[in-house]
């Protein structure tokens, strides 16, 4: 059975191409199926906390919070990345949740480049902006 998710008026699982045209207020976004197939689904599978519900949750968050990747930093606020996670939330997950779950921490660190960990015990929240996979992984862990 095919699943359908409608986000910003777009069907994420539709076999038809999404048509876009000029609008009064246009913005650029990441094409939803590409984001799902090339970032969200593989990231969740590698974390081993995947599935249809998890995909919908993360894609819905991305659609709502950043308009499908239009914004990598909240315009008048601290939230970062395609899932718009605030740095204190990021840090709290590392300090109060991941530190007690070494297996999940090990999985998450696969999305963190080595340079981001030099001399640190956890990555800086700014990695949420530069790594789509890391942002998706942190979003899923947050839920």
Predicted regions and their residues:
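C-terminal segment of classical bacterial N-terminal signal peptides
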Residues: 15-16
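Sec-dependent N-terminal signal peptides
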Residues: 4-12
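Peptidoglycan-targeting cell-wall enzymes and recognition modules
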Residues: 23-39, 44, 63-143
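Catalytic phosphate/metal-binding cores of nucleic-acid and nucleotide-processing enzymes, i.e., regions
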Residues: 46-52, 60-63
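Alpha-helix N-cap/helix-initiation sites
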Residues: 50-55, 75
């Amino acid at each position: 059975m095919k699943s359908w998710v409608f986000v910003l008026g777009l069907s994420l699982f539709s076999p038809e191409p999404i048509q876009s045209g000029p609008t009064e207020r246009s913005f650029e976004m990441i094409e939803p199926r590409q984001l799902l197939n090339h970032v969200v689904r593989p990231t969740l599978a590698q974390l081993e906390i995947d599935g249809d519900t998890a995909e919908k949750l993360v894609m819905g968050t991305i659609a709502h919070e950043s308009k499908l990747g239009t914004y990598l930093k909240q315009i008048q606020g601290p939230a970062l990345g395609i899932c718009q996670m605030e740095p204190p939330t990021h840090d709290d997950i590392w300090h109060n949740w991941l530190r007690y779950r070494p297996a999940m921490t090990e999985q998450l660190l696969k999305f963190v480049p080595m340079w981001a960990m030099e001399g640190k015990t956890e990555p800086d929240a700014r990695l949420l902006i530069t790594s789509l996979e890391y942002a998706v992984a942190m979003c899923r862990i947050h839920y």
